[in-house]
């Protein structure tokens, strides 16, 4: 909270925060050797939203990590839906030689990872659509970066909402 408070006092800060989640399930995070819990992640998000009411929270979510059960995946999916993200990069775990997870039991099949990816991507899209609906009708400063087509300019708001202007 102290660091977030200092950030909130900065005039030149764009309120878009990328916080890598990896999984919304505590058991999966422990197997990944991550040193945070979903509850701690949620608390950080709540603190950011309190300090920056219109901030965008983006993340990375992995599906199909070694040993991820259907129940654990369900927890992660529910967490992503609950937290409400502006955007999420969803990817499937891929086994890599020499890593700790290489020899772990419970490797998830390619087909199952594809199924889980599709479900997680859909949840992420729903969160993104809800975030974007909240931006509609707002008057915002936009940094236009390029002309996309004749008469069409492309840029971003302070919270990294993509804007096209004709």
Segments predicted by a language model, with ranges:
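Conserved non-cysteine loop/helix-boundary elements of the Radical SAM core domain that shape
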Residues: 1-87, 93-112
């Amino acid at each position: 909270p102290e660091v977030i408070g200092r950030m909130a006092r900065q005039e030149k800060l764009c309120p878009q925060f990328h916080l890598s989640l990896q999984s919304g399930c505590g058991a999966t995070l422990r197997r990944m050797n991550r040193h945070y819990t979903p509850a701690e992640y949620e608390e950080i998000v709540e603190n950011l939203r309190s300090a920056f009411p219109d901030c965008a929270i983006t993340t990375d979510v992995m599906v199909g990590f070694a040993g991820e059960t259907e129940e654990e995946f369900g927890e992660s999916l529910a967490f992503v839906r609950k937290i409400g993200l502006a955007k999420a990069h969803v990817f499937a775990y891929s086994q890599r030689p020499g890593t700790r997870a290489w020899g772990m039991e419970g490797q998830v099949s390619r087909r199952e990872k594809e199924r889980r990816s599709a479900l997680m991507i859909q949840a992420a899209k729903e969160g993104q659509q809800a975030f974007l609906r909240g931006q509609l009708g707002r008057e915002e400063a936009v940094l236009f970066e390029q002309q996309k087509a004749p008469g069409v300019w492309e840029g971003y708001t302070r919270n990294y909402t993509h804007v096209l202007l004709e």
